[in-house]
Each structure stands twice: as C-alpha cells, then as structure tokens.
Amino acid sequence: MSFKDLRDFLNHLEKKGQLKRITHPVDPAYEMTEISDRTLRAGGPALLFENPIGYDIPVLTNLFGTAERVAMGMGREQVKELREVGQWLAYLKEPEPPKGFKDALDKLPVFKQVLNMPVKRLRKAACQEVVWQGEEVDLDKIPVMSCWQDDVAPLLTWGLTITRGPNKKRQNLGIYRQQKIAKNKIIMRWLAHRGGALDLRDWMEKYPGKPFPVSVAFGADPATILGAVTPVPDTLSEYAFAGLLRGSKTEVVKSVSNDLEIPASAEIVLEGYIDPNEYADEGPYGDHTGYYNEKEKHHVFTITHITMRKEPIYHSTYTGRPPDEPAVLGVALNEVFVPILQKQFPEIEDFYLPPEGCSYRMAVVTMKKQYPGHAKRVMMGVWSFLRQFMYTKYVVVCDESVNARDWDDVVKAMTENMNPILDSLFIESTPIDSLDFASPVAGLGSKMGLDATIKWEAELALQGATVSTEFASQIGIDVNALKAVHPLISDIYVPAVASGQFMVVKINKTHAGQCKEVVESLWQVESVKQRNKFIVVCDDDVKADDWHDIIWAITTRMDPARDTLKIDGSESCSAKLVFDATNKYPEEITREWGKPIKKDPKLVAKVDALWQEFGIL
C-alpha cells in the first residue's frame, strides 16, 4: 500500500490503531520527549499532540517508533518484506542484463517499478499554500521541541535537507539535526562525508564566498522521508527511490526562493542559504548514544522564507539512549542492508546491527566460510563497502549456524572458536563518528574485528600452544569466590553458554587504572587463569546480565585499541582479552568525556500523574 502524503499515512495508521491523538495540552519543551520515550519503549503508537502549549501547530512524534510502521511507510506489510527493497537497491547499484527470455520476465516487475522513478513536477503545491517571508519568518511560531534538560537550545530533527552541488544534476536529500539559534537562523550539523556537506564543499570551491541555496522540508510522505535515510546508490536520487517504493512518481515543486525541488506534499518548508563564512558552536545535545556531545563548529543556515500547508503538522522526534526512533529505523533498515551486502559478498548469511550498539557501532555477520582468513575479508568488506558502516567500531564474524541476533549464541561462538589474541584484528586511526567521545580525537579512532568462525587447518597451525580444553573444563568457576577477590567488584556474570570462558565484571570505579587493577587480581585465580578468554569490565550503572546494557557500554565507552587489554596464552594460561567498558577519568583519555542523559524526576512525576489520562497504551 502506498501513501500520497503524510496525512494519508496518518489516516491509515489511525484506522489500524497505530496513531493516538493527544488532546491534553503538552509542552514541546521536555514533556513531549518523556511521553514519546515511554510510548516507543512500550511499542506504542505514533503520537499527534494536538494542543502544544503556546502554539497553534500540532506536533507529530514516534511516527517510525516500531519497525512495522517503517515497513508500512515503505509500502510493505511486514518487516521481513524489506529484504525485497534491499534486493531492488542491490540490483540498481549493480544492474545485470537479462540472461535470457525467462530471466527478462523475472526482472519485468523491477523494470516496471523503475518506470515510476522520475519525478513529476508541479506548478502549484499544497506545501506553498501559506508563505512567510522577510519579517514574517519566525521559527518561534513553530513548536520546535526541546528534548533534554541540558540541551543548549530547541532542536529541529526530521527535516529533509535538500541541496545540489554545482557539479551534479541530481539533488541530495539528507536528514541532519539543526539547532535553533534565532527566529530565522539554525545551525546545520552535517558530517563531512554526508551528501549535503559534500555539495557545500563543491560549491565553496566553485563559487567561493557565495551563498549556498538550501531548502528543508518537514512532513513529506513516508516514502520520501524513508528514502532520505536509506542507502540509495549515488547514481539514484532519493526522490526516484521514493517513487520506486510508492509505485508512483514523486511529486515535487520548485522552492519559492531558489531552484531546489521540494516534496509537493510537505507540511512545512524552510528556504534560505548558507553563508560559507558563517559558523556557530553547535551543541551540546543529548544524542543517540545516551550522552551529551561536545560543542562543534558548523555552518549557519539563514532562513529567508517559510512555506506551509494550511493547518500544517510539525513532524519531530528526540534522540537518546537506545531504543529511540533512529534505533528503530536502524532495526528496520537492517533488513534492507542484507541483500545489498549479499550482492557483493554472497557468502554472507545474515548481518545485524544491534540497536543497543547505537545502531551502527557494532555489527554481527554470519557467513558460509570457504577458505582460511575468509572472516577477515568480510570484516574489511563491511568497513569499506557502504558509507553507512565507516563508523562501525566492532565487527564480529561467525559461521552461518550462529544466530547473529542472539548474544548468547554469538558469545558461545567466540568462546569456542577464538584465540582472543590471534583472532582479533585492530586497525587504528580510522574514521569515527565525531559524537564518539571515547575516540582519542574527534573523528579518528580504532576499529576491532573478531573472528568467531570455526578455524581451518591453516589457521590452527598459527595458534601455537593453548591450554588443554579437557584440563580447563575440569576447573570450576566459583562466582561468589571471584566477587571477593577485589573490594571494587560489585557483581560478576558468567553466561551459562560460555563455560566460564566469558565473564562480565561490575566495579565501583573511583579513579583511573582500576580496571587493570581488578583484572590482574582475577588473573591470579587458577580457574580464571586457565579457562577465561574474555572479560568485560563495566561500571556499577550497567546490569551485568543484560546484553543490551553490556553492548551499549562497550560501544559508547571504549576505543577498541586503547581500551582492550591483552595477555598472550601459554601452556598454563589461556590467551585473554579484557574490554574496559568503564567510564574513563581524565588521566585515561585525551578529550572531554561524555555526560550521560538523565531525566528530571519532577518531569517524570508530572507525566506519571497524567499518564492514564493520555490513554496511549
């Protein structure tokens, strides 16, 4: 099923019980975040706040708060059908000519869909029913959400930013967070490798000092919104891909103040320019990692016109510790990624980006291994094939018999098949998300690959001396005794599947260097010395037996090369890796550490008191 605009989609969701209208007055400052966060974590509906306090424009949140609604937005009934979308993209990325008449017939549905890809240009559109310009331009009239108490300013989150570089025919659509700093100015935070930033860079080279035209659309139809977050081939526009999803051409109209084409059905559109010489400090904001990011300088977008539909809807969201809406999108788009990767690497059986790993910082791959060293080739492929994975810090590769989405199964493969030292790969000074405060410097850090596949003869020949499995299995693990080894230890978890070879240790860390101090004490215990291969050390705020907590700590609090301790194996001691997933003190790092997002107890209590009245769940 396809949807011509956002309102058509909302009507469909409401009929299915997937949209809740909130008539009670709610403040866009913090209250909407608290309500939306609770709803998303419970798998609840999209929310339409019809009476935002101080504003006349309703606010839509949690639109893509379940993977099922993402699938609906892409015209699919079930999440598993998103694999078909990935197959289309894989084909469009590297199309193959038909091998014969039957093959041509099989490809016919794709060819028919491709015919719907060009845009349909309109002379008039609903998104320009109302036009503000000059002194009328005023973001204070739009209910822009403030998400967390320590955020520096209100934040625009779901805008489709439309740009065109001077050397390209097609436009780029991207979603970048935007900090409100005045009634007609926002800060455009886009990473250097993203399409909008690349277009601006090319513009500055060709037209130095000249203003760069930009339009930002809020509340487009779901296919166009989701097209902007999907790994579309560079040769294909997001509008064309949206037409492919929808089964009909994307309708666009020219902006009133520049030549950029915007979604004709959008609810609100900001138009203006970026002065290449105008920058401002962006942040800090609570983001998808669960922490506040550092301040960074980014370009300022000056708004000259705001156009909108009559009685528009403002589409918004929040970002915070997973799960949040970006994490849910990541789970759904995971199904799209699999066929794209399989096109290049047919040996891949499954690919999983766990949402608790901030959606992209860790990947688990299962594969049909065909030769020694094959797992390392797949690791390199993941890091290099798609831009979406250039910031993935950890890649774990397992055999096809392993369930990539089950941490017990993955850990079992790690403990059974890995020499922690020889089967781990570290690469330093690689591109890293600038929001990753655990990296040594902004934008540059290390990556780690873990080969948890069953080893072939050539690989075993490199293993050298190892502890006898039969001997090690006879040594029991006494968790209570281990807790008493060091006073800083508050809890220890040994997964049943790991046979004592993997443990999670919680400590009450109070100063630098205590992780190493604790594990060195544990290494003196014979059972740990002989059997253990992996230790994850976490702070006391992590649940030792909760994989979501553990993976979140590893992916947010570690630089793999700096924070992984190693000990080589011998005939009397197993090789070991220690993941120091604790918060770091100034002596242990070279940049400012992240501040965790914390909820205001008074706000939580206020929403508690009103929760039943909302009737959301």
From Swiss-Prot:
The keyword Zinc-finger does not apply. One of its GO terms (biological process) is ubiquinone biosynthetic process. Its cofactor is a divalent metal cation. Its EC number is 4.1.1.-. One of its GO terms (cellular component) is cytosol. SUPFAM superfamilies: FMN-binding split barrel, UbiD C-terminal domain-like. Keywords: Cell membrane, Decarboxylase, Lyase, Membrane, Ubiquinone biosynthesis. Pathway: Cofactor biosynthesis; ubiquinone biosynthesis. GO terms for molecular function: 3-octaprenyl-4-hydroxybenzoate carboxy-lyase activity. Disulfide bonds: none annotated. It is a peripheral membrane protein. Homohexamer. Catalyzes the decarboxylation of 3-octaprenyl-4-hydroxy benzoate to 2-octaprenylphenol. NCBIfam families: PRK10922.1 (NF008175), UbiD family decarboxylase (TIGR00148). This is 3-octaprenyl-4-hydroxybenzoate carboxy-lyase. It comes from Vibrio vulnificus (strain CMCP6). The lineage of its organism: Bacteria, Pseudomonadati, Pseudomonadota, Gammaproteobacteria, Vibrionales.
